[in-house]
Amino acid sequence: MNRDEITLVGAGLVGALLATLLAQRGFSAEVFERRPDPRKAGFLGGRSINLALAERGWHGLRVAGLQQRMQPIAVMMRGRMVHHLDGHAELLRYGRDDSEVIWSVNRGTLNMTLLDAAQAAGATLSVWRRRRCTTVMPMA
């Protein structure tokens, strides 16, 4: 393996985004995943259905060129609603105005979008069912 070849373990949100960014920059990125490819087998979940995406997450999507793809399916969340015992409800905003919000996106859709982008950029996804990464031999 040379220094331009990078191996990633895990094709979740972070692994898929990192593979995309590395491949876009000319690195040979290979992602190993023990679960089936959700684009073929369907998204299996295991975590919450929706994901709250803040500005830091949008930044990563912008750098990868994916914000335009995800923005139309994101739902703005301005704050949380507190229901008091006396019956009235109160919105506790996440920020001062609508420039300081978080966004709800479907985790499966985001993951599959990131995997598509990684593959389109030249990254390789290798599915190793029922195998785990237990040791790493770093390059000297």
Can you name each region flagged by the protein language model?
Residues 16, 20, 111-112:
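Short, hydrophobic alpha-helix immediately C-terminal to the catalytic nucleophile
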Residues 18-27, 60:
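A short, Lys/Arg-enriched amphipathic alpha-helix followed by its capping loop at the start of a domain
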Residues 1-14:
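Beta1/beta-strand and adjacent pyrophosphate-binding region of the FAD-binding site
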Residues 2-5, 54-140:
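Conserved N-terminal helical subregion
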Residues 9, 23-46:
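Glycine-rich FAD pyrophosphate-binding loop
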